[in-house]
Amino acid sequence: MAIRISRHAQKQMKWRQITEAEAESTIAEPDMQQDSIKGRKNAFKTLGGRLIKVTYCREGDDIVIVTAVIKRK
């Protein structure tokens, strides 16, 4: 299983200073998870005092990160 990051997510992660490791950790071990639109999932995790939300979907055996944001608690 590979994790790929969409171009949109790459831009958002760079702008919001979310590392790939933080995004992958959020997906692998979320504090909370919920269904989203179009068969996507939202994973939430608090890391370094920030609540990170990663939206992702499955494409075959791969996981594709659609976007990542910092949420207010």
PLM region spans:
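Ribonuclease/tRNase effector modules and their secretory precursors
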Residues: 1-73
